[in-house]
Amino acid sequence: MRFTQATVRHTARPDEPPGAGDTPQQARERAHPSPSYSAPSGAGGPFGGQDLLDGLLSDEPAAVDADVAGAVGATLARLLATRVDDARALDPLFARDVAERVADFTLRGGRRLRPRLLWWSLRACGGGDRAQVRAALRAAAALELLQTCALVHDDVMDAAAVRRGRPALHAAVAAQYGDGAPATARRLGESAAVLAGDLALAWADDTVTELLADGADLPPGAARRAHEVWRTTRTEMVAGQYLDVQGQATARHTVARAVRAACLKSALYTVERPLELGAVLAGAEASVARALCRAGRCAGLAFQLRDDLDDLFADPGVTGKPSGGDVREGKPTYLMALTRARAVGTGDRHALEVLDAAVGRADLTGAGLDRVRDVVVATGARDAVETRITRLSRRALRHVVLAELPQPRAAAALRELLGEISGPRDGAAAPGHRPAHAPSPPAGAAAPASSLPVAVAEVAR
């Protein structure tokens, strides 16, 4: 079951060279092919048939425990093979340029963080019968498709050329059609990416609908509650993204605003809601689900604060994104809002001048980015954020303990995962960067706050 472009190309005779009979458009497509559709890593290579897809799947909880990411990848592979076949039957060009790219992007995935959180929440809450396993894997697949929608659209909004170390979807489509007018190719790439994100969201909703239709064997009320969580998740994701781009456009970089955006865009969507979905599908009591939601919000905020630090200080080879993207795009991150607030509080004019000259400058040089790093360190913002990450992570683990989860081994796995997502990645220090020492505040200036604003504690309570 491989993606093929044979249906839209001239078929060469044995005595013809490759490409014979190609139209100019087909020649361009041959030079810039769309990605092939392969099985997930470790699944044995490209799809060869439905039997391979069936063999990858298991509704045995122990099998999923051993490789959550692999099980979710197999579920996605089967689901996406069907979706792409449907798209190909509808129109081969649409399938090749849009549907296959959505499938390829989703299957390559990232850390499969949301599926892992959902799964270990389900298991820690005592879930694990076959109906629950199937529902959890479908819900996890839907979360990954929702993430595809978010990332593909995000790259268009940010004009980001790279995602996960590869050309972003809109950039890849533009390159495929790039021998025409550059502006036309760029516009086509952006339009295709918007449609690709829409398609990913539609496929995610289809997957949840199928889950609910087969939900008779789930605990009483689980399907209804899962649907409510799903509806909330979608809206929170969009709201968080809007706060992000609106703050970027209007330069509203207050600390409270940054916390609110981080809560909606990352804490809820990335961590809290997957944990809640797992608890709901397991039939957990409402009190247990609430405790896990609190844990997820704390860990999710820590996750976003870590991401802010990584954008500025981590090795691009680790993150898969150019360093300093948030600064160049003028994103209203917590880290930059806190840096500015501390500079204002201490009367540090030099720091404010550096920030004013750098934030939102797409052409910011490496030297300019180093000056921003120096200011973030010198104001104490970097250390303050690291301290808050540690406190939020500890609070998240306490909430897991307070949930009194019935499965100790799965609960331990969940605690380990929550600790992992907010911890530093390898290569956290930017190569060659030597941070400056913090200067003494001017005489009479207000001392910087000893901790981050109350807003973090309020949303993470």
Regions found by a protein language model. Give the residues of each.
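Short, charged, amphipathic alpha-helical segments
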Residues: 224, 228, 293, 387, ...
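Hydrophobic, well-ordered secondary-structure elements that form the walls
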Residues: 336, 396, 414
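A glycine-biased, small/acidic residue-tolerant capping/turn segment at secondary-structure junctions
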Residues: 306-319, 349-356, 408-412, 429-433
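Mg2+-dependent prenyl diphosphate-binding active-site environment of isoprenoid biosynthetic enzymes
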Residues: 92-348
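Charged, amphipathic alpha-helical oligomerization/scaffolding segments
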Residues: 67, 71-78, 82, 229-232, ...
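Hydrophobic alpha-helix feature that most strongly marks membrane-spanning transmembrane helices
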Residues: 297, 304, 314-317, 340-344, ...
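Conserved N-terminal diphosphate/IPP-binding helix and adjacent helical/loop segment
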Residues: 1-143, 148, 152, 157-180, ...
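Mobile late-domain/C-terminal helix-loop "cap" segments
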Residues: 350-403
